[in-house]
C-alpha cells in the first residue's frame, strides 16, 4: 500500500477519508530500502537521537514552523487556549491546552469515553488481536504489561488503541472516574507508531517505552491505562495526583513532541464497545475520534 493511501473513518461524518501522512517519503525510505531499515533501527534504539530532536523543537526559532503546520494540516486553532503568537516554540504549541468547552465529555456513569484525540481500533476480545500477528508471532500481552499476573487479568478481556498523529491534540485524559494509582514505567525503545510502520510491526507496543496506570472504578473494574512513547517523543508527562479520585475527562498528562499511542485494557465482561467502532475495526479501519466521545458502555448481564 502506498504511503498516501492510508484510510480511516471520520466518526463525525461516517465517511472514509484519506489520512494526511507526515514525512511519507522518509517513511517509505525506512520501510522499503535495506539502508533505511538499518538506519531506522539504530535511530529508534538510541534515545540520544530522540532527545536531540526534542531539544531542537524547544528552540525559539521553531515557533516560525507553527503557522505553516497549522495551515497544512488544517488544525482548528480556535480551539486552543492561547493564540498562536503566545507559543514560544513548536513543542510549546505541540503540548497546547484547549479551551474548556472544546471537548465536551459524554455523560453517564456507565459510559467510558475516548481518552484522547486520535485514530481508534477496538478489540472486544483479545483473541481479535490475531489480525495483527506478524510472521506468525502473536501480540504478547505479558510482554506489553511486563507483569504475568497483571496480563492474566486482561487475557480474556477487551482492548482499545488510540493512535495520536503529530497534528493531533497531545494531552490525554481519564476515560472513566475512579481511583488512579501511580504509573509504572517500562523502559524501552522509541519505534515509530506511524500507521505504515504499525501495519508492518504491531509488536512495537511491547518494545517501546511505556507507562501503566491502573484505574479502579465501580462500573468498569480495574482498567489498565497505558501510554506508549514513539519516535521523537522524548518523554511522557503525567499531570495528575496518583492515589487520588479522578473525574472522567480530567487531564491525565501529555506527550512531548512527536506522535504516540494510548492503550486501554478492560477485564472480561466490563465494557461493550460502541457498534460503529467495532464494525470499522473488524474491517481493519481506524476511526478518528475526539477526546470525550463515547467509547463504550458498562457491560450489564
From Swiss-Prot:
Cellular component terms (Gene Ontology): plasma membrane
Cofactor note: Binds 1 pyruvoyl group covalently per subunit.
Pathway involvement of the protein, from the record: Phospholipid metabolism; phosphatidylethanolamine biosynthesis; phosphatidylethanolamine from CDP-diacylglycerol: step 2/2
Claim: Lyase is one of the keywords in the record: yes
Active site: 117, 173, 260
Residues under site feature: Cleavage (non-hydrolytic): 259-260
Modified residues (Pyruvic acid (Ser)): 260
Alphabetical list of PANTHER family matching this protein: PHOSPHATIDYLSERINE DECARBOXYLASE, PHOSPHATIDYLSERINE DECARBOXYLASE PROENZYME 2
Subunit structure: Heterodimer of a large membrane-associated beta subunit and a small pyruvoyl-containing alpha subunit.
Topology in membrane: Peripheral membrane protein
Enzyme class: lyase
Gene behind this protein: psd
Keywords tagged on the record: Cell membrane, Decarboxylase, Lipid biosynthesis, Lipid metabolism, Lyase, Membrane, Phospholipid biosynthesis, Phospholipid metabolism, Pyruvate, Zymogen
Protein known as: Phosphatidylserine decarboxylase proenzyme
The organism of origin for this protein: Chlamydia trachomatis serovar L2b (strain UCH-1/proctitis)
One protein family per Pfam: PS_Dcarbxylase
Role, per record: Catalyzes the formation of phosphatidylethanolamine (PtdEtn) from phosphatidylserine (PtdSer).
One record GO biological process: phosphatidylethanolamine biosynthetic process
Single annotated GO MF: phosphatidylserine decarboxylase activity
Cofactor: pyruvate
Post-translational modification: Is synthesized initially as an inactive proenzyme. Formation of the active enzyme involves a self-maturation process in which the active site pyruvoyl group is generated from an internal serine residue via an autocatalytic post-translational modification. Two non-identical subunits are generated from the proenzyme in this reaction, and the pyruvate is formed at the N-terminus of the alpha chain, which is derived from the carboxyl end of the proenzyme.
Similarity-based family: Belongs to the phosphatidylserine decarboxylase family. PSD-B subfamily. Prokaryotic type II sub-subfamily.
Broad class of where this protein is predominantly found: membrane
InterPro entries the record matches: PS_Dcarbxylase (IPR003817), PSD-B (IPR033177), PSD_type2_pro (IPR033179)
Subcellular location field: Cell membrane
The EC number(s) this enzyme carries: 4.1.1.65
Catalytic activity: a 1,2-diacyl-sn-glycero-3-phospho-L-serine + H(+) = a 1,2-diacyl-sn-glycero-3-phosphoethanolamine + CO2
Amino acid at each position: 500500500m502506498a504511503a498516501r493511501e492510508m484510510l480511516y473513518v471520520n466518526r463525525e461524518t461516517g465517511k472514509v477519508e484519506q489520512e494526511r501522512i507526515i514525512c511519507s517519503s522518509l517513511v517509505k525510505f525506512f520501510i522499503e530500502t535495506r539502508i533505511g531499515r538499518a538506519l531506522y533501527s539504530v535511530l529508534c534504539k538510541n534515545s540520544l537521537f530522540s532527545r536531540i530532536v526534542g531539544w531542537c523543537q524547544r528552540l525559539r526559532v521553531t515557533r516560525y514552523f507553527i503557522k505553516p503546520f497549522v495551515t497544512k494540516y488544517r488544525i482548528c486553532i480556535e480551539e486552543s487556549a492561547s493564540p498562536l503568537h503566545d507559543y514560544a516554540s513548536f513543542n510549546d504549541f505541540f503540548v497546547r491546552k484547549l479551551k474548556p468547552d472544546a471537548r465536551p465529555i459524554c455523560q453517564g456513569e456507565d459510559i467510558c469515553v475516548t481518552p484522547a484525540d486520535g485514530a481508534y481500533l477496538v478489540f472486544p476480545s483479545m483473541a481479535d488481536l490475531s489480525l495483527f500477528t506478524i510472521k506468525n508471532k502473536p501480540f504478547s500481552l505479558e510482554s506489553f504489561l511486563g507483569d504475568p499476573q497483571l496480563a492474566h487479568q486482561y487475557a480474556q478481556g477487551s482492548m482499545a488503541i488510540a493512535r495520536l498523529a503529530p497534528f493531533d491534540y497531545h494531552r490525554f485524559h481519564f476515560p472513566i472516574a475512579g481511583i488512579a494509582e501511580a504509573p509504572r514505567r517500562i523502559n524501552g525503545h522509541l519505534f515509530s507508531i506511524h500507521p505504515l510502520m504499525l501495519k508492518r510491526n504491531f509488536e512495537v507496543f511491547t518494545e517501546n517505552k511505556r507507562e501503566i496506570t491502573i484505574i479502579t472504578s465501580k462500573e468498569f473494574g480495574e482498567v489498565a491505562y497505558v501510554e506508549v512513547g514513539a519516535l521523537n517523543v522524548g518523554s511522557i508527562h503525567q499531570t495528575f495526583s496518583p492515589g487520588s479520585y479522578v473525574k472522567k475527562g480530567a487531564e491525565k498528562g501529555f506527550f512531548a513532541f512527536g506522535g504516540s499511542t494510548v492503550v486501554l485494557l478492560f477485564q472480561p465482561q466490563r465494557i461493550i464497545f460502541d457498534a460503529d467502532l467495532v464494525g470499522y475495526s473488524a474491517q481493519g479501519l481506524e476511526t478518528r475520534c475526539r477526546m470525550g466521545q463515547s467509547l463504550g458502555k458498562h457491560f450489564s448481564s
